């Protein structure tokens, strides 16, 4: 059966094709950003009146005139999402403002996060009670030496210490946004106390078991890297090593996201195809994949990047089962809504911004960059034509089709990968400069090595850790011997080579200049219903404006 397409159809005379879910997500973001400036910078609420022309603008530019009921409904939906973002973030801010410092007191809670440093153990407590009163927030505490080896995830603690409210300023909100979204508003110092019990939590139990097995079965550095790749926990990686990995441009392999979830998704599809499950009903297959992906997302604490990738994979798989071709931009919009509707402050986290910037870069630029590669390949073949075999000549004469050559298939795979990688790096470049102060010169080269490597090893690594979790702890070393050796060999590269030597550093960029940069890239895409000459003219003008802005900022 032929697949149906649910993307918007081109509209004659309109600038772009309207995607309702994508624009709903955009207006949700607008509402969150407006509330941020309203609450932290006292921006007047009267500016909300600008919502009317803002919502009308994309509708009139992308929808045909005359369908007033449809246009009115879409207008209401966009305004509604904007207001949801505004009030949703406002609720989070109110929750923070209603918390106060307690000073010296007794408090209890359940350990939901835990990270071990050299001389301390940091825990996050949920279900918090202070002096017997329930609190609608979480607390960070650094445990005393007496509790270092006694506490695990989901343990219940009764402690005494000095509890203070964490100060969160607008200027440093991006660094605090992750904890803000988790409602971690309090910090306890000079802590003493005891463990009082344990409450079972499936996700925390699986997370703790995986960490324990990995630490028991592998050497220190390979274990830290394995925890990062599988669980997104980079706390155990030695600081110098992690900094070198960052400058190599591949730190994203430790932020569990589309690369990891996509590998797990592909493995699930392989299981369905190669086992008796292939004969089961499509609904059962979908629920099997959904349960596996959601279970993994839960073990990773439902981080924004994991939720985004999970939603996109499930939407794509559902579309395949019901024979409807899905739209990547719509899926991205849906994933953003699923995250921001519950925790609007996630918008300001670096991980969320980098994750979605990379995906939007792929959606907008991968195809145009691939077309540039194809034009280059055509030009090369013009001067260096391929010699056709007798079978190919015979097929041409008989007007038959031949399967592509191995060299052609290799070119397609390599060009597709390079186009995707370049597109993601182009869109994330301003964020890397803004938050980290550099852009790696090694990124493209090392991504060509490590992205396929992680894609290939991830499922194997997950299977081996799962098997080790099901077996006695004493056998973990034997089960995890292979990944331990592989990581030890791979990490030698980052011990030997200093990747900080080739990076663009010391360059400043502002939010306004970043927007001009993004506008320039968007005009070079095929998402506009404009003549190519006009798109390139507008894109060139934005490039010039970007260059002028960067020179002005960095002189």
Model-derived features: where do they sit?
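N-terminal leader/targeting segments
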Residues: 1-96, 482, 523-540
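Internal transmembrane alpha-helical bundles of multi-pass membrane proteins
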Residues: 5, 28, 302-542, 549-554
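Aromatic-rich juxtamembrane segments at the membrane interface
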Residues: 5-17, 26, 181-312, 317-318, ...
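Hydrophobic alpha-helical transmembrane segments
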Residues: 51-53, 258-269, 510-523
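Hydrophobic alpha-helical transmembrane segments in integral membrane proteins
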Residues: 82-104, 544-555
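Short, surface-exposed secondary-structure edge patches
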Residues: 96-103, 146-151, 201
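OB-fold single-stranded nucleic acid-binding module
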Residues: 113-196
């Amino acid at each position: 059966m032929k697949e149906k397409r649910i993307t918007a159809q081109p509209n004659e005379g309109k600038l772009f094709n309207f995607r309702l879910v994508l624009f709903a997500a955009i207006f949700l973001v607008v509402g969150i950003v407006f509330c941020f400036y309203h609450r932290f910078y006292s921006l007047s609420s009267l500016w909300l009146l600008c919502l009317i022309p803002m919502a009308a603008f994309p509708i009139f530019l992308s929808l045909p005139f005359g369908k007033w009921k449809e246009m009115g409904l879409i207008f209401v939906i966009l305004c509604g999402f904007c207001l949801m973002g505004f009030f949703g973030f406002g609720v989070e801010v109110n929750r923070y403002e209603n918390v106060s410092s307690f000073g010296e007191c007794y408090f209890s809670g359940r350990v939901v996060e835990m990270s071990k440093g050299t001389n301390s153990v940091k825990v996050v407590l949920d279900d918090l009670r202070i002096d017997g009163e329930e609190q609608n927030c979480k607390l960070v505490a650094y445990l005393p030496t007496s509790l270092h080896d006694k506490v695990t995830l989901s343990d219940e603690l009764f402690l005494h210490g000095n509890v203070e409210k964490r100060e969160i300023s607008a200027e440093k909100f991006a660094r605090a946004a992750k904890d803000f979204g988790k409602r971690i508003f309090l910090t306890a110092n000079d802590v003493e106390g005891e463990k009082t019990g344990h409450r079972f939590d499936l996700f925390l139990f699986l997370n703790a078991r995986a960490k324990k097995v990995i630490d028991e079965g592998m050497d220190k550095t390979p274990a830290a890297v394995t925890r990062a790749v599988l669980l997104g926990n980079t706390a155990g990686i030695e600081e110098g090593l992690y900094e070198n990995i960052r400058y190599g441009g591949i730190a994203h392999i430790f932020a569990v996201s589309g690369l990891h979830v996509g590998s797990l998704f592909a493995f699930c599809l392989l299981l369905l195809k190669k086992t008796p499950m292939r004969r089961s009903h499509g609904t059962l297959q979908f629920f099997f994949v959904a349960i596996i992906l959601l279970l993994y997302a839960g073990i990773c604490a439902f981080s924004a990047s994991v939720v985004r990738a999970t939603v996109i994979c499930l939407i794509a798989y559902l579309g395949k089962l019901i024979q409807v071709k899905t739209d990547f931009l719509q899926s991205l919009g849906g994933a953003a809504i699923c995250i921001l509707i519950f925790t609007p402050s996630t918008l300001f986290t670096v991980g969320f911004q980098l994750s979605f910037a990379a995906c939007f870069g792929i959606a907008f630029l991968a195809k145009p960059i691939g077309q540039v590669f194809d034009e280059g390949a055509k030009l090369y073949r013009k001067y260096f034509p391929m010699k056709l075999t007798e079978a190919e000549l015979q097929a041409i004469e008989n007007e038959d089709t031949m399967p592509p050559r191995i060299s052609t298939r290799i070119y397609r795979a390599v060009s597709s990968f390079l186009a995707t990688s370049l597109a993601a790096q182009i869109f994330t470049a301003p964020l890397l400069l803004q938050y980290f102060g550099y852009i790696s010169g090694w990124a493209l080269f090392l991504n060509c090595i490590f992205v396929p490597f992680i894609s290939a090893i991830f499922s194997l690594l997950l299977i081996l850790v799962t098997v080790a979790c099901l077996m006695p702890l004493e056998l973990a070393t034997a089960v995890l011997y292979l990944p331990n050796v592989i990581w030890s060999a791979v990490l030698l590269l980052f011990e030997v080579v200093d990747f900080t030597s080739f990076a663009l550093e010391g360059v400043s960029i502002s939010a306004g200049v970043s927007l001009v940069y993004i506008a320039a890239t968007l005009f070079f895409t095929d998402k506009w219903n404009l003549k190519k000459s006009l798109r390139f003219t507008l894109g060139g003008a934005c490039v010039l404006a970007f260059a002028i802005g960067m020179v002005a900022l960095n002189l």
